[in-house]
Each structure stands twice: as C-alpha cells, then as structure tokens.
Amino acid sequence: MTPSDFISIDYKTLTKAQLKSYIDDLAEYLGEQSYLYHTIDKPVITDSDYDKLFRLLQDLVDDNPQLKPSNSVLDRVGGEILAGFETIKHKKKMTSLANVFSLEELRDFYDKIEYDIELECEPKMDGLAISIFYKNGKFDYAVTRGDGIQGEKVSENVKTIRNVPLKLNTSNPPEELEVRGEIILDKQSFLSLNEYMQTHENKTFANPRNAAAGSIRMLDSKVVAKRPLKLYSYGIGYFSKDFVHPETQFELMNLLQSFGFTISDNMFLAKNFSEVEVYHHKMSHQRADLAYDIDGLVFKVNNIKLQDTIGYTARGPKWAIAYKFPAEEVESEVLNVEFQVGRTGAITPVARLKPVAVGGVIVSNATLHNINEIKRKDIRVGDRVIVRRAGDVIPEVVKSLPQYRKPDAQMVEMPTNCPVCDSAIENINDQAIYRCTGGWHCQAQTTERLKHFVSRKAMDIDKLGAKLIEQLVAADLIKYPADIYKLNFEQLTGLERMGAKSSQNVLDSITKSKEPSLARFIFAIGIKDVGEVSSEALANHFGSLESFREAKFEQLIEINDIGEIIAKNIVSFWQDSLNIQIVDELLGNSINIQNPEKIEQAHNESFTNKTIVITGTFENYNRTELTQLLKSMGAKVTSSVSKKTDMVICGDNAGSKLTKAQDLGVEVIFEEDLQNLL
C-alpha cells in the first residue's frame, strides 16, 4: 500500500465494518512507517505524507472513538527498540509534540489556551532526539527516544560529540537531571561527509537526519568521534527535588546554556500572536540561510506553572505545538548557473544553490530545464528562488522572488560553445534544446554514454559504477564501449582506491556481460530516443542485429512503439560511420548477442491488440509469466491505468489501480475470469 491508496478511498461511503477494517489497516501501515523512520532510519514515505495520514487516522478515531485500534501509533511515540542495543527506561516519558500545518491552526492552538500568554519560539531541528542523564552534575548515560518509555543506550557515542557537556558548568548541580535535545549534522558537514562516504564506501546518507541517527547507532565510537555531530538542547525531562526550576521556558533555556549546552540562536519570546506571525514569517524566509536543517517551528507556553495547569495528553504536552513547514517547496539562493552536457549532447542549465532541505533531502543543485525557462521565470544569479522536489524527481527552481533581488544579480546567457569540449552548440529549428556537436569527441558525452552502456537495464556491468567510469575516462583508459572489454588487472589496480579484489570483481562483471539479449544491446548502444520498450519491440520484430542494421524507415514506422522521430534517429544512427565502427568493435571483442526466440503468437480475441494492466498477486501465476503470456497473445502490457487502458487484470491486494480502473470505467477481470478467457 502507498499513501495515495489510503487517500484515494472515500471512507465516507464505507459501512461500519469496512470503516473498522480501513482504520485498522491505516493504523498498521502508520506503525510500519513509524518503525522504518524511528527505529532503523530507513523511511520510505515523506514526512508530509506521514503527517497527512496520521491526521486522517486521528480525525477518524475522533469521529468514531469506538473504532479506535489498540496499541496503535495514536498511543505511542517513535518506534520499537532495536534488539541489539541495551535498553534503559527514561526517568520521565519522552513524548512528542502535536503538529499543525497552517497559521490558522496555530492560531487555534493559541486561542484554546484561553490566557493572555507569551510563547517561547524556536526552530524545530530535524535530527535524532536524545536524553542525557546527569548525576551530581556529571554525564552518566545517554538514551535515544526509542518508544518514549525506554530507549537505546548510546552513551559512548554521545560522549564523542564535542559540544555535549561531560560535566555541568555549575558549582551547585542537581542530584539528578535529564537534559533533552536534538543531535544534528549541519548542512555543510553533511555534504562533506557524503562526499567522503561516496569516495571511500560507495554509499551516501539520504539526509542529515539519517546521517546523525546512523552515526549515533554505530558500534565503533572512534568512527563517530570523527563526524562533526552537534547537540542542540531544547528542554529537560526528569529532575530531582533539589533542582531549582526557573519560572519560564525562556529562562530554563538560558539556564541550560549557562550549564554548557548549545541552544538555538533563533529562539524568540513572543508576547502575543502578532509577534508569533512575525517570527513565523522571518524563519520561513531565513530557513535556507540556516546552517542546519529544520522542518518546522516549535511554540511553547512560556510560563512553567501555566504549562502544568494546561497539562498533557497520552502523546505529549498540550502547552506546546510544532508547526510543520510544507515539505515540497522552500526558498534558497542561486549562487551560480552552470551548463551540463548530457549523453545526447543536450545542454542543461543547472542552478548551484545555497544548500537547503527539500522533502527530507539536502539540495544544492536544481535543474533550470532550458534557457527559455530561465527567461520565462526571469531567474538570475544571486536571486532568491523557490525550489521544489516531489518524490524522487530531480529538484527544480519553480520561480524567482524578484522582490528580494540584489542590484548585482546577473542575467543568465546561453554559451555558444560547449563548456567541456569547446565544440559549437547548435539549436535546431529554434527549439528549447541546445546540443553540443562534439559527440564522442566530447568527454562529458563520452562519460555519460559509457555510464548508460554499463547500466543495469543495458549491459548490466554492475561492478563498473559511475565513479569508476569517470576515473577510467579521466585516465584515458576508455573512450569507446569496446575499450571496457580491453581493460586488464594492472590498469584497474593502478587506479586510486582500486585493490586486487575490487579489480577482479570488475573484470568478472565485464566477462559476465558478454552475452546480452538483443534488446539490451540495442538499448546499450544509445540510439537517441530508443528506450527499453522500443528496444524490446525492435529486437522482437527484427530478431537479429544484422536485420536491425539494414532496417528501412518504412519498415520501422510499422512497428508498435516506433514513431517517425525514433525511426529517423535509428536510420541516422546507422548512417554514421563512427557508430558502425563502435558496434563492430564490440562484436569483435567476443560480444555474443542472444537473439530472441521467435514466439508464435496465439490468437485470442480477448487480448489481441489490447492495452492491459496487471495488478495484485495471483495464486496460479507470477507477474513476469503472466506478462509474457499476454504479450504472446498480442497484448500490450503497461504499468499504469489511463483512459487508453482496455483491461485491468486484478489479483489479491489490487490497490489503487483497481480503484482508478473503476473510476475510469475500464473493464476489470479477476483471476477466475482470466482462466476462463485463457
């Protein structure tokens, strides 16, 4: 299930029994996502989606309290405890804050308190929550939030953080004190760590929060000590009777600072809601300029006695609230605009941005698409801009904010020559796309073409990654695809960070790739606009590389999935003597292409020339077998439902595709119907 599967269901039309099932499923799903986020630090949905679903579950249970699921995320904070860690019970429950997502909701929170109050305001840092226990002023142990009742003991790692006091800076420390805070990695340190990780371990962290959480859970504290983690304190938990508690939250934070803890420079005391709005506006605008990642703002009733009067819910305090920023769009600043050269020579302008968190990921680059878009949006170097990142989509600059434009902001101009090889840049028929004419003579195009050639869906040389391709091209060891098959052990071990084992793995991977299917080979040689689907269609139609090389334009356009533009590109490809030479050299290096077996197409009126989508799980088929079976009967199998879909075949747990098919009036059949038709 995905967030959209839950959101797409109209729960108002459900019976009580169906609604109970829906609520239970939603609670179970949120429990799984909470575990992935809080316990193993591998979230698969965005914070924004989680917050929407949590709010939906809350609303449903508020309206139907008799349907409240037991032991759900509504009763818990965070995730379960990893089995491999010693667990320690918090002296005082480590709760979390309720969320609001608009100024209107924030105003509701303020008005409900029914007092003329001051609010202590601070950034909501996005890191790992921690509780540090001090005994007689000395560091005793540190515990993660865990499930709010007990957490993982990570004392040795937390001790390595430079700004964590090992002894409180006071001559009269309390006997016992729990200090709460957030362990973070600032944006610049995160980028530096990821660069190191990519170079030395060939992996990276998704965002600063994951980097901080992953570091604190490492077994080797010596490694943790090398990472520039920081602790920002935001409050206290348990305290012994001899602790003299300040009268206000603001004074408490100043006291913690005097003890030696780091607190945010952006704390503010709002005397009324108008000042809350001013703080909200200021921090929303300055978010991109902060050294660290924040995902919202926190507002706490300043008066401690009033906090006690207002009280708590099972999840957390009623006297504090977290305002969450919209996850999709944030402000940043364009530091520079550079032009990248792609596999086909397309020149793409890329904005170099002041690093900013968008959708849980630190973004320092964003596409500007093309020069026409830059002019239309009036984007200049030095501008404040809105940056968007949705799902796994490449970040883009949505618009500029000219009201903040500096006098020295620079217009962006398209270069006349390639920034890599200095070849001329051409613009055909005044289209938005500009291309470098250097082809294989352009190192940028060469590098990207070779990365494509070895990729998983092409020749699938899995041990020959992008970074190694860049190394090999820079060392002038490879220029054309055939050069990959000429690499030897000595050349590879001579490269930086390439040992004997790694080098042999690369050579084994290269050898393994020498018998590709015809479809993979066609895709790998990189004919413009020929993707996976087109490659498979061409391979199945022509049956051999020899037949494909001789194909005429008229033959090509008769094939499903091959339009006139692709047909022209194929003809042009085989008219280029360098392309022919590259392919011939590959064949001369023991590449043995596996031609597809000719499948006699069975005629079945139910499936021939039909566009079909398969969804769910089946008792008598796996998805791959069923796809091939339908294709053999002349069907076109696609992955998404649209108005062009003729039929959706549903197994168990069909999900949103079934719902969409029903909404569009597309024919739906189930496994029993399928067996009858076959």
From Swiss-Prot:
The organism's place on the tree of life at top rank: Bacteria
- Among its keywords, does the record have DNA repair? yes
**Residues reported to bind Zn(2+):** C418, C421, C436, C442
Cofactors (names): Mg(2+); Mn(2+)
BRCT domain spans which residues? 602-678
Q: Which species is the source of this protein?
A: Francisella philomiragia subsp. philomiragia (strain ATCC 25017 / CCUG 19701 / FSC 153 / O#319-036)
Q: Which GO terms describe its biological process?
A: DNA repair; DNA replication
What Pfam families does this protein map onto? BRCT, DNA_ligase_aden, DNA_ligase_OB, DNA_ligase_ZBD, HHH_2
Catalytic residues of the enzyme: K124
Annotated SMART domains: BRCT, HhH1, LIGANc
Catalysed transformations (reactions):
NAD(+) + (deoxyribonucleotide)n-3'-hydroxyl + 5'-phospho-(deoxyribonucleotide)m = (deoxyribonucleotide)n+m + AMP + beta-nicotinamide D-nucleotide
Binding-site residues for NAD(+), renumbered to this chain = D47, S48, D49, Y50, D51, S96, L97, E122, R145, E182, K300, K324
Q: What is this protein called?
A: DNA ligase
Family membership = Belongs to the NAD-dependent DNA ligase family. LigA subfamily.
